[in-house]
Structures are given as structure tokens and as C-alpha cells.
């Protein structure tokens, strides 16, 4: 019996229609069918160890994992509503894949090499800082910075005192709570935070820094995770509050901000211009850090951009170029960076080994205290409380640059990265100085 010629045509049409329906589901701009094909390709590459240990291999793995995990987290009810959405889900799931040995170690090495070794993180952060600062109105930027820094520093100081007092109440002692919870959680991350902090402690105590570092690392991990979750919660709970600036940090300046943030049409040449200018500021910060090693490079980067903006040293064409490049990086690489954080920085084994109820309580106290204090002070200093709590508060409990990105991604406030970095880097440097003095008396 012969098939009717129309039957095969109808079957082909139905398949195409089904594929078309699936392709309407888009993950970061890519249809589901095409995404599934690339995902299968990635799984085969990883399982056959043919994923290149290069920038290309890292980008392919991190972008695909980051986008799909973020998509899932953003659509899962509990994560979406209460646990920081796609940002937290991406970081947690990639960290769990590593902890359970589902993800091979060579993939972790490839991801870490791209983010830290090749310093893609540095490019991402400087692009974001430059973009967000140049996008702001000049007068508004200076007014916001002058009000923001006192809020950040006072919040950190008061939070440390609260942690110490709670440490006494729950039986671990004031000194322990300050040295092993307050200082590391607000020190500015790992490389610029607890690594030099462990050296300071080790020198004062006459012990090896490796043992000290193993005690400090869990604090940074849990503090970072709680900060990300809290940022998502705060932005959601206070969504309709008068204290929510919806991404604007300075109260009463929304009209000026809207005028300053006019739409910039994409231009291929300007994207390249924006890239090299962003890198130029990174080089300025790096070179000044070599001359003054006691001051973090990002502090110099922020200062150089603020001065450039304040004195109008860059024509609008170049400012727009930087803004444009920063937007491209944020929209396309944020999820990849979050996946990289989970793969290479969030060690679940270390975190679980350190868990005790006192440890968890003190980390929670740090999060709650710095959120409430910074929100209250922010309101007094003319900032929106929600934005103050996230940038002057929670960002100072995060894991440095990567933590700031995750905190702001969870709260959908990536445009405030400059303020998060400002408080985190300058505040972190102050923490190291204060810790160096305190450890002499508290050891």
C-alpha cells in the first residue's frame, strides 16, 4: 500500500510547527531547540574531555550554563520569590555540581583561569563601573558619593559592634565574633580581603596564615550567599515602598536621572572605543596601585573616573561609547560570570564543614544589622533606603567584586556597581587597617 504524498508533507509540517513552538521559548535570546543542541554539544565536550582549556572553551561552558541556570532560577517559584532568583540558583547549582563531582575538575580549572587568571572579572567590573558612572548626571554623582561613603563606613562600624555583642550573648566571646566574623565578612572578599587579613592575624599571633585562612574562608562564603539572597528579598518585599528608588540611589533626583539616562543607539565602532577607554581606566588604577600598593586598584579606578566625569574631561561621544560597551557586557556576560563564581569560588565542602549554630547566627546577625543600619542611615543622608541597604550594606558583606555582581544581579540594580565597589574596596581597606590594630589586643 502506497503512502499518500500529502501525508509525509503533513508530518514534516507538524514537526516544523512543534519545533517552532519550542523555539518561541527563548533563553537569553536563543530558541530552546538551538539551545538544547548547544547544551548537548557542551555535555559531549565535557564528558569526552574535548572542551578546550582556553578562553573559547570557558566562554562556551560558562555562557551556556549561566544562561540556562539563570533562566530556571528566575522561573522556579521559591527561588524567584524568596531566594534571590536566577543569581542564587546559578551560583548554588554550579557549586553543587562541583561538590558532587558531577563537574570535572578540569572544567573548574578552565573556568577559574578565564575569570581570575585571564582576569575577565576585571574587564567586567571596570566596564560596569565606567558605564554606570558616566551614565549618571555629574552633579548627582558627586552628591551621591559624598552621602554614600559615610553611610557605608558608619554601617560597617556599627554592625561590627552588634556582631561582637551578640557573640558575647551566644557564648563565643566578643573578640572571636569581631576577629572571625565581623572583620572577614566585611574585608572585601578573598584576594583583597581575607588573604591579607590572614597574613595580618598570622603575624600578630605567630602562627601560619594557612590555618587562619581556613577559619576565615567559610565566613566569607556564607556571608556572601546570605547577602545575595537578602538583596533579592529586599528588592522584592519593598518593591512598592516609597523607600525604593528602583535603581536610583539619591532621593528626589529621579527626573534628572531620567534625563541623563537617555537611550543610546548601538554603534559598532563605538563599542570598540568603549572597550579601550574602559581598559584605559583599568590600567590607570593598576599603575597607581603599583606606586601606592596600600590602596586597592579599584579605588583608583573609581576615583579617576569620578574626576574625569566631574571635570568633563571626556566628550559625550566617548562617554556614550563606554556606556554602550558596559551595557553589552552586562546583558551578555553576567550569567556566565555567576556560573564562574559557583564553579571556582563557592566551596560547599568548606562551608558545610564550618557550620555551627553560633556561626550561622553571627553571619545572619551581620546581614540583618548592616541592612537595617545602612537603610536607616541612608534615609537620614538623603538616599533611598532600599538602595542604601543593598549597596552600602549587603555589598559590604559580599565576596568582593564577584559578590557585588551577584548581589546587584539578585536585586536587579547592576547600574549601582560603582557604589558597591566604592564601599567594598575602600571599606575593605579600612577593615584591614582596623583589624591590624585590634588583633594586637584581642588575640
UniProtKB/Swiss-Prot annotation:
First and last residue of the signal peptide: none
Xref: Pfam families: 2HCT (PF03390)
Main location: membrane
Keywords: Antiport, Cell membrane, Citrate utilization, Membrane, Symport, Transmembrane, Transmembrane helix, Transport
Annotated membrane topology: Multi-pass membrane protein
Superkingdom, taxonomy of origin: Bacteria
Keyword Transmembrane in annotation: yes
Activity regulation, short description: Uptake of citrate is not affected by the absence or presence of Na(+) up to 25 mM and is increasingly inhibited by increasing Mg(2+) concentrations.
Membrane-spanning intervals of the chain: 27-47, 59-79, 83-103, 114-134, 151-171, 177-197, 209-229, 268-288, 294-314, 322-342, 350-370, 388-410, 422-442
Site (Plays an important role in the generation of the membrane potential): 425
Catalysis: reaction(s): (R)-lactate(in) + citrate(out) = (R)-lactate(out) + citrate(in); (S)-lactate(in) + citrate(out) = (S)-lactate(out) + citrate(in); citrate(in) + H(+)(in) = citrate(out) + H(+)(out)
Swiss-Prot/TrEMBL GO biological process terms: citrate metabolic process
Example GO molecular function: antiporter activity
GO cellular component terms listed in the entry, alphabetical order: plasma membrane
Subcellular location: Cell membrane
Domain notes: The 46 C-terminal residues contain structural elements that interact with the R groups of the substrates. Interchanging the 46 C-terminal amino acid residues of CitP and MleP alters neither the specificity nor the affinity for the di- and tricarboxylates malate and citrate. In contrast, changes in substrate specificity are observed with monocarboxylates.
Family of this protein: Belongs to the 2-hydroxycarboxylate transporter (2-HCT) (TC 2.A.24) family.
Reported function: Secondary transporter involved in citrate metabolism. During cometabolism of citrate and glucose, catalyzes the uptake of divalent citrate into the cell coupled to the exit of monovalent lactate, a product of citrate fermentation during citrate-glucose cometabolism (precursor/product exchange). The citrate/lactate exchange is electrogenic and results in the generation of a membrane potential. In the absence of glucose, i.e. when no lactate is produced, CitP catalyzes the proton-dependent transport of citrate and malate.
NCBIfam families per the UniProt record, alphabetical: ccs (TIGR00783)
PANTHER family: CITRATE-SODIUM SYMPORTER, NA(+)-MALATE SYMPORTER
This protein's name: Citrate transporter CitP
